[in-house]
């Protein structure tokens, strides 16, 4: 298992070539430190060239800010983006923005407090996780120049990092570092994020076993004729299978991580709302 700590990204040909080569050839997880969210455009250019379809989960406190930044990304960068979920956003920083209908897996800060595990399925399904320091409470990132009293705790931020390491997320990005002045608390918080990411990767490598899947097929699961669900008996994880075979560049989205509740809802004859949003997004790419 190899790790790539690319340092602070710079928009130059040398680093772009390096990232493109890593994405094209490496089977390892990639960890990137990034100055600001706008640098994600640079990463998406490289994933496009590497023919990687992206499902992105962004952890940030402002939907308005994220929407403004993403609107400036090049059309080429967005060609192979399946989804951009934006979570941990705060209402007063997001009132003027909305998430496009084709995107899914976005959660307000209020829905995550004391139940950060809500993000476990979205992170498991994503191949790019972007964690911005804006999402943290000021008390846990005291060196941040822009002050936000509300946010995730360092412990919740660490759970996100570990989940990215433990699941199939290929690229994990810690961003917003341009807004942080080094001090003892901030350095400790950022170091913990990296530690728990690595801990997640190591834990996964130690516990991984060949999946033992039990299939549950639901006939007439509207709007589809049938949908197959799978439960991994080794870890009780659930997956919903997209009903037609996907092309190679989308094969990572054939089986969608979900919960038992998605299966229970769908067994009544209609696909669960979260899975419906995801399948609609895949439909748009395939058709």
Q: Which positions does each model-derived feature cover?
A:
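Conserved alpha-helical scaffold segments that buttress catalytic/binding sites
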Residues: 1-287
């Amino acid at each position: 298992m190899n790790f790539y700590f690319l340092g602070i990204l710079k928009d130059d040909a040398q680093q772009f070539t390096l990232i493109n080569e890593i994405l094209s050839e490496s089977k390892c997880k990639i960890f990137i430190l990034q100055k600001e969210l706008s640098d994600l455009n640079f990463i998406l250019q490289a994933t496009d060239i590497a023919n990687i379809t992206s499902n992105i989960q962004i952890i940030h406190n402002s939907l308005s800010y994220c929407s403004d930044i993403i609107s400036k990304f090049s059309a080429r960068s967005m060609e192979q983006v399946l989804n951009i979920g934006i979570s941990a956003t705060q209402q007063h920083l997001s009132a003027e923005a909305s998430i496009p209908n084709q995107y899914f897996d976005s959660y307000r800060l209020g829905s995550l407090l004391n139940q950060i595990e809500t993000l476990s399925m979205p992170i498991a399904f994503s191949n790019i996780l972007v964690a911005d320091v804006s999402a943290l409470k000021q008390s846990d990132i005291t060196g941040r120049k822009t002050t936000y009293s509300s946010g995730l705790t360092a412990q919740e931020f660490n759970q996100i990092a570990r989940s990215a390491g433990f699941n199939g997320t290929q690229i994990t990005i810690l961003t917003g570092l341009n807004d942080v002045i080094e001090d003892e608390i901030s350095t400790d918080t950022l170091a913990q994020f990296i530690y728990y990411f690595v801990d997640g990767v190591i834990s996964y490598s130690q516990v991984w076993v060949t999946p033992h899947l039990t299939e549950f097929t639901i006939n007439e699961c509207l709007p589809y004729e049938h949908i197959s669900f799978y439960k991994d008996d080794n870890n009780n994880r659930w997956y919903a299978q997209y009903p037609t075979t996907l092309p190679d560049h989308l094969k990572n989205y054939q089986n969608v991580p979900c919960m038992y509740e998605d299966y229970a809802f769908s067994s009544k004859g209609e696909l669960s709302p979260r899975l419906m949003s995801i399948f609609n997004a895949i439909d748009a790419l395939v058709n």
